[in-house]
Amino acid sequence: MALALVLNSGSSSIKFQLVNPENSAIDEPYVSGLVEQIGEPNGRIVLKIEGEKYTLETPIADHSEGLNLAFDLMDQHNCGPSQLEITAVGHRVVHGGILFSAPELITDEIVEMIRDLIPLAPLHNPANVDGIDVARKILPDVPHVAVFDTGFFHSLPPAAALYAINKDVAAEHGIRRYGFHGTSHEFVSKRVVEILEKPTEDINTITFHLGNGASMAAVQGGRAVDTSMGMTPLAGLVMGTRSGDIDPGIVFHLSRTAGMSIDEIDNLLNKKSGVKGLSGVNDFRELREMIDNNDQDAWSAYNIYIHQLRRYLGSYMVALGRVDTIVFTAGVGENAQFVREDALAGLEMYGIEIDPERNALPNDGPRLISTDASKVKVFVIPTNEELAIARYAVKFA
């Protein structure tokens, strides 16, 4: 069985999967795992092999040790690189800037180009590079492929991609809308076309990727024409801990009147805002319980969250001119039926009508949740970014 190894390397963790690229979107990966608490004394590796879970708790000094320990654990259970045919390694890279519009075969030169983009993604790209460096040393004889979160949005028209600031400053510092979650938005927009069995160019779709991080995209005939995240993943929708869109003047106000540093404001907007900043929690199951108990902070957070979803929905309906499908995906989008219901409530005049019974069904693969009479077909489609990355990677094998 030919498999692709998919790596998502974070600052203190590595998520990985061994994926059969021929799988369907809802098939479980052959192996999945998580290396966490890298650099901490309480490091842990969790491995899931065909439904069975195995755990190793040990200090993990760095990414190199973490990935080597994970491979050793896989070898112990007869599913390591030495026992299986790994044909390619796909790496999720958060920011490709304007340099990368498609997956790239990784070379030393490509690694340096990704490293040069660290100022655009200081929280993500350094860890992505660490994962690439480690994996290339452990598996030097298979192709390694970088798949960029931003790549799908290279098709944005200038009116959607550029900010109205001094063009020379923007050009010098790479300031523009890049968009994120691109692999997910592309995956589900392609899936809905497959489900409908229609030509890609005939379908206009609005995609909701709603997890702890959240974004939306307008996809016209297979090409992204707008998206909610911007130069960074902080922009756009209200998220679990991120503020989403705010008046930029708030940054100056906090600096001048509260004496907050840039790093403190960065931390506030990225980690202490959003639904958590408003309600104290960022888990939508907890938020729902608080709403059911009539917690006013939870109600306020939820209403602001839904308001922002509907603002972007209306904007993208205008941008596309004609909407054929709407797709919800990711943790909240796939599982929170109340979010889907409230995001699309009262839009029957625009041809959008949710079927309450279909919407209430459990998350079990792609499904239609709109009524038969709805002109716009609304779907829940589980995303599978790892499968998408695996399919890209094996093309270079």
Curated annotation (Swiss-Prot):
**Obligatory cofactor(s):** Mg(2+); Mn(2+)
Cofactor comment: Mg(2+). Can also accept Mn(2+).
The EC number on file is 2.7.2.1
| Induction of expression | Activated by RamA and repressed by RamB and GlxR.
Q: Where is this site: Transition state stabilizer?
A: 181, 242
Q: Which SUPFAM superfamilies match?
A: Actin-like ATPase domain
- Residues where Mg(2+) binds: 8, 385
Q: Indicate which residues the UniProt annotation says bind ATP.
A: 15, 209-213, 283-285, 331-335
- Kindly identify the residues recorded as the active site: 149
Q: How does it assemble?
A: Homodimer.
Family matches, as PANTHER family = ACETATE KINASE (PTHR21060), ACETATE KINASE-RELATED (PTHR21060:SF15)
Any idea what this protein is called?
A: Acetate kinase
Q: What is the scientific name of the source organism? A: Corynebacterium glutamicum (strain ATCC 13032 / DSM 20300 / JCM 1318 / BCRC 11384 / CCUG 27702 / LMG 3730 / NBRC 12168 / NCIMB 10025 / NRRL B-2784 / 534)
The UniProt gene name for this protein comes to ackA
